[in-house]
Amino acid sequence: MASSSDLADILAVRGLVAGYGGRPVASGIGMTLKPGDILGLLGANGSGKSTLLKAITGQIRLEGGSVTIDGVDLAGAPERAKVGFGLAIDPPDLPAALTGRQYLQLVASIRGCVEDDWPGVDIAGRLGLRRWIERPIAEYSLGTRAKIAIAAALLGAPPLLIFDESLNGLDPLAAFEVKRIIRALALSGRHAASISTHVVEAVPGLCTRAVLLADGRIARDWDARQLAEANRTPGAFEADVMRALEAQAAEA
């Protein structure tokens, strides 16, 4: 049986530089995600998290470096690369005039699957979306919009799942269900996930790796062993993150 280090990368980011108007916001970032990885992406506002995710998902151009998604180079074949990930952001920017079902159909048509092609589970049912699915998204609360965005991200079970603060607006039951689904997909050995969050204390219990961004660079990272150890002591991980942020601020 192959070790995790022998598995092909689902996401490979090498020397990434990205920003706006020629001004780099994220610089020199390198990381890989393999099947089974769940990455917690941390950082204060303005640390470069959103810029990094926009660059990885092709929403802004790379100014340097490379991004490969499930073996496909983002710059060389952007449309093929984008089929390899599902993205849910907060707040979700969704077409308000469409019903939930129409939006899922739209995403499914882009991804080449059907509107309820979820990974072995009824996501709409699990997230309590069935009573909303035929109603216009304009009528949805922020929490329900987050749910439909997550359901769309999971359509077709793409290899890479990216959640940008999208778990924050969920009610406790929906958040529990989404985390359970993410864990199951990772354990299947065919998927990896990146979860950007400000809820630092939730990371050790969900993620197998974590990265802290500061000033557009990786300031600290944690592996599975370190997260498991931190998870055994309440508050240990939060304290570690705070120390890393303070050290970074002292160097600035």
Language model features by range: what are they?
Residues 57:
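Helix-to-loop junction immediately C-terminal to a conserved catalytic motif
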Residues 65-73, 81, 222:
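Conserved ABC transporter NBD signature motif
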Residues 42-44:
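The feature captures the beta-strand-to-loop junction immediately N-terminal to the Walker
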